[in-house]
Amino acid sequence: MKRRNADCSKLRRPLKRNRITEGIYGSTFLYLKFLVVWALVLLADFVVEFRFEYLWPFWLFIRSVYDSFRYQGLAFSVFFVCVAFTSNIICLLFIPIQWLFFAASTYVWVQYVWHTERGVCLPTVSLWILFVYIEAAIRFKDLKNFHVDLCRPFAAHCIGYPVVTLGFGFKSYVSYKMRLRKQKEVQKENEFYMQLLQQALPPEQQMLQKQEKEAEEAAKGLPDMDSSILIHHNGGIPANKKLSTTLPEIEYREKGKEKDKDAKKHNLGINNNNILQPVDSKIQEIEYMENHINSKRLNNDLVGSTENLLKEDSCTASSKNYKNASGVVNSSPRSHSATNGSIPSSSSKNEKKQKCTSKSPSTHKDLMENCIPNNQLSKPDALVRLEQDIKKLKADLQASRQVEQELRSQISSLSSTERGIRSEMGQLRQENELLQNKLHNAVQMKQKDKQNISQLEKKLKAEQEARSFVEKQLMEEKKRKKLEEATAARAVAFAAASRGECTETLRNRIRELEAEGKKLTMDMKVKEDQIRELELKVQELRKYKENEKDTEVLMSALSAMQDKTQHLENSLSAETRIKLDLFSALGDAKRQLEIAQGQILQKDQEIKDLKQKIAEVMAVMPSITYSAATSPLSPVSPHYSSKFVETSPSGLDPNASVYQPLKK
């Protein structure tokens, strides 16, 4: 490569292109690339009859599982896979096929465009509209051109996996908010305890710490001198006044702000325990302001009584009495304020605040010098109450420490019990493992026994076959021996008759044959002994098999009996329930029958009473006949007649002219 020196003075100035056109040029190429990728994937889907866009969420899922296994462990990755699988199964079962494919394809392409650097803009929205239109108009109705069963699980994953990721995102957001809330609570508690610790220090150390804080604040305020000077030139406040303010005034202002916030929250009234006294000099007034503010802070923070003292508590000291340096109390009628005193008006508060804040730096310096001895000499009743409150708080602190020790002892005992339980769990696990090992060994032994039985059966079959073969050979040998003996006898007879020369050779042959016969008989006895032993082994194995079969039969019979007993118990419980229901129904029927019988008796009694009354009335009224002289009609029957009355054993005389009551 050649090194070329460029002339800097003759560099060409690049053409300035407008940002709008640059964005258009960059984005058009990007969106053209998106359209080309989309068209290629759709073409591949049409050619191969498979939706390749469903593989992108699957690839994202594999990457997320790998990242979770790498950074969060195996347990979380397994949990994530199980949750995603469950979500996929739910989407696969409960979403229709057409809507499933439509939602999956639309989500994939929308998410693919969403991952660009442009975000939401007009081209992305137009692409989204195009994708949704193509999916809804063309591909939503055409599901027969590809493998539905193969693509359906991937489509369910395209919907289920984003649901899982959204759920985890929502969970992380909620946990983040809860963690921030917990941090704020802990920060407030730490600030409260820090204030308690600072206020528990002696006043000398408090003053030293306040001076150090003031020096640090002044050192921090030094870099802002230039800006403060500019503000002063433009009519603002110079920074020297801020630096020259003394500690009581700063603390007074800060405490005034804190009390404004507390007063807005609580508004509980003025504390009745603070007794303020007037003073003659301004130094003692400001010293009293500081003491009163400190006492109010301790009362508010330690005792917990929230007061409604605003800025008037620090500035009303000019109108009230206080002890002087020698400890003498002014005895004027304005020396003691009322315990249930009211809050002064806002105008007086503002005037007193202006008086308090308009003190010169020299007065504040004298205050800093005289603050500690005056605090040591003068102790109002508020300080006595504060000391009592501090003692109470110390007692409460000791009680809380005792409670803490008790809780720690309980925690230690619980931890020891937990350790014991864990050791017991370990022992139980070991015992369980031993039992499982024993069971495994027993199963293996059973399998080995079965294998041995099968091998012995094979050996028995082979021995039986060998025995049958040997018996056949023996029979053949016997036949051959008989034939040889017959031929030998014939030959001997023939030789004796004809010649006496071959007798010796025949005798030798006979002896050899007898020896072979003895050997064969011995072999037969040995084989028979082996066969007997094998038969004994076979019988033992058969007995073992029969015992196993008996045990299996007994176990099956036992399980059947248990099922029968369970069924009988269930049927018995059902019968008892039915009997109880029948008894309850019978009792209800008896009660209703008794009630009906009582009502019937009551009605019968009422009927008898009514009949008796009707008879009495009929006996009292005379029989009246109505006749018409002019009309030839038949006489009209009376309205009330004794014929309609039933004959009852009544003591009344129906023919009596006057009613006579019965004599009892």
Swiss-Prot record:
Its main location: endoplasmic reticulum. The modification Phosphoserine is found at S305, S332, S631, S634. Keywords: Endoplasmic reticulum, Glycoprotein, Membrane, Nucleus, Phosphoprotein, Transmembrane, Transmembrane helix. The keyword Translocase does not apply. Disulfide bonds: none annotated. It is a multi-pass membrane protein. The chain crosses the membrane at residues 28-48, 75-95, 120-140, 154-174. Residues 253-274, 320-375, 630-664 are annotated as: Disordered. Residues 320-348 have a biased composition (Polar residues). It comes from the Eukaryota. GO terms for biological process: neuronal signal transduction. Residues 253-265 have a biased composition (Basic and acidic residues). It is found in: Rough endoplasmic reticulum membrane; Nucleus membrane. GO terms for cellular component: nuclear membrane; rough endoplasmic reticulum membrane. Pfam families: Macoilin. Glycans are attached at N324, N340, N452, N655. InterPro entries: Macoilin (IPR019130). Plays a role in the regulation of neuronal activity. Belongs to the macoilin family. This is Macoilin. It comes from Pan troglodytes (Chimpanzee).
